[in-house]
């Protein structure tokens, strides 16, 4: 049958799937209640997606750091996702008109809008399947809020630290975040990429948008910017993935636990981009190797790639192909690990679940999905450690940030590097 790929919104031919809508539709209530009771205590979450800042009021009315400057902003940058069904159309339009992630050439704007309009109803159906919207904003707010509480204790010299969200394709958008920074009297801002592994199509696209909006608003010199541009080997991140895998392994009978194959699944990338030297592929490999080292290589593992779009070659092997081929060889027990994501969203809650249902229909009954790091305090502590090191090092970005891909011909890439070199 023809299935609509939920993550990249393209049609692809697959085997039939079972109806698991009700299970995913209960995701929000079940997951969030477990989080509040069992993992950590957090303040109540407001679903108002237009609010860009999370718990932004400085403690005890403080509006300046001990250095006499304004608060330090930590801006959580990500693709984002529609928080409700009404946001799906605008989300798709922003996505398909962005040449950094989906290049359509001369007809980028008109063709992108056309594609978005045609696909909106189908994509809305997929978001309905997971509860009516993406949980990515919810988890990003929790991560940012808890991280900044830790930063206030670790780095009193730059406190208070205020968490903000800047999504590329869904509210809260980059331009709204900049207005909120101004209102909060921010002096220094850290652009914290929520893509642990760098790709020009993800981290690069978000920073390109930040540059554009700073110029459009005439805010180039309003804030002192620095960038956490990649963190594939951050120990808190590695430990959080490992802990989630260990918890899932415990759900298997003890006598088969060591035989479970761990499948690290990341969003795929066109081979044309890989051939240019985009570092994403080897940074994904670095993360998965580090996780397996933390697990003492007790299980076999495979790197796989999901969400391919169109007929051109993309990174392989595809995640669903890996599941099927291993299953054909008698391997029934596998754990799918979304290794490139810091929170659950449509690609984990819908696409990976579809793969699991496909596998069950083929008799591959032991495939399970590991949750993203979401509200893991291990990961959040790691984020705080990372940003604290960044603040104390007083460097604008990593050494690798100014290294363009050997085959890069993108003007926006060169403009991004030149722009942030001035800070």
From Swiss-Prot:
Pfam families: Ferrochelatase
Domain of life: Eukaryota
UniProt keyword terms in alphabetical order: 2Fe-2S, Cytoplasm, Heme biosynthesis, Iron, Iron-sulfur, Lyase, Membrane, Metal-binding, Mitochondrion, Mitochondrion inner membrane, Nucleus, Porphyrin biosynthesis, Transit peptide
Binding site for [2Fe-2S] cluster: 200, 405, 408, 413
Any one of the GO CC terms: mitochondrial inner membrane
Pathway: Porphyrin-containing compound metabolism; protoheme biosynthesis; protoheme from protoporphyrin-IX: step 1/1
Active-site residue list: 385
GO molecular function, one term: metal ion binding
Cofactor info, note text: Binds 1 [2Fe-2S] cluster.
Catalysed reaction, written as an equation: heme b + 2 H(+) = protoporphyrin IX + Fe(2+)
InterPro entries documented for this protein: Ferrochelatase, Ferrochelatase_AS, Ferrochelatase_C, Ferrochelatase_N
Enzyme class: lyase
Any single GO BP term: heme biosynthetic process
Known EC number: 4.98.1.1
Compartment(s) of residence: Mitochondrion inner membrane; Cytoplasm; Nucleus
Record-annotated membrane-spanning stretches: none
Quaternary assembly: Monomer.
UniProt similarity note: Belongs to the ferrochelatase family.
HAMAP family (alphabetical): Ferrochelatase
Protein name: Ferrochelatase, mitochondrial
Origin species: Schizosaccharomyces pombe (strain 972 / ATCC 24843)
Designated gene of the protein: hem15
């Amino acid at each position: 049958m023809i299935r609509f790929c939920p993550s990249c919104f393209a049609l692809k031919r697959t085997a039939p799937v079972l109806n698991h809508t009700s299970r995913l539709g209960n995701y929000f209530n079940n997951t969030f209640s477990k989080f509040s009771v069992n993992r950590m205590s957090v303040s109540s979450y407001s679903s108002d997606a237009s609010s860009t800042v999370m718990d932004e009021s400085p403690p005890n009315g403080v509006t300046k750091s001990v250095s006499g400057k304004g608060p330090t902003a930590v801006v959580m940058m990500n693709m984002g996702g529609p928080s409700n069904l009404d946001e799906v159309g605008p989300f798709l339009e922003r996505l398909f008109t962005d040449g950094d992630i989906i290049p359509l050439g001369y007809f980028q704007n008109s063709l992108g809008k056309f594609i978005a309009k045609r696909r909106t109803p189908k994509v809305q159906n997929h978001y309905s399947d997971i509860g009516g919207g993406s949980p990515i904003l919810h988890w990003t707010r929790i991560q940012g809020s808890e991280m900044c509480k830790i930063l206030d204790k670790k780095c009193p010299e730059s406190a208070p630290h205020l968490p903000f969200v800047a999504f590329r394709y869904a509210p809260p958008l980059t331009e709204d975040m900049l207005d909120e920074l101004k209102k909060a009297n921010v002096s220094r801002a850290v652009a914290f990429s929520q893509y642990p592994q760098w790709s020009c199509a993800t981290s690069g696209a978000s920073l390109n948008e930040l540059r554009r909006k700073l110029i459009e608003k005439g805010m180039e010199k309003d804030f002192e910017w620095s960038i956490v541009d990649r963190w594939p080997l951050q120990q808190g991140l590695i430990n959080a993935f490992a802990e989630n895998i260990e918890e899932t392994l415990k759900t298997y009978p003890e006598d088969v636990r060591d035989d479970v194959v761990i499948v690290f699944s990341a969003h795929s990338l066109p081979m044309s981009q890989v051939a240019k030297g985009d570092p994403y592929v080897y940074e994904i490999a670095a993360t998965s190797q580090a996780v397996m080292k933390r697990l003492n290589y007790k299980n076999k593992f495979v790197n796989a790639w999901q969400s391919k779009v169109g007929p051109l070659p993309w990174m392989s092997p595809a995640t669903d192909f890996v599941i099927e081929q291993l299953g054909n060889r008698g391997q029934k027990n596998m754990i799918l690990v979304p290794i490139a994501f810091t929170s659950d969203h449509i690609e984990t809650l819908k696409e990976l679940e579809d793969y699991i249902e496909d596998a069950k229909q083929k008799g591959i009954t032991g495939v399970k999905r590991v949750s993203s790091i979401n509200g893991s305090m291990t990961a959040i502590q790691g984020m705080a450690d990372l940003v604290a090191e960044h603040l104390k090092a007083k460097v604008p970005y990593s050494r690798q940030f100014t290294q363009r891909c050997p085959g890069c011909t993108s003007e926006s890439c060169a403009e991004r590097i030149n722009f942030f070199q001035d800070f």
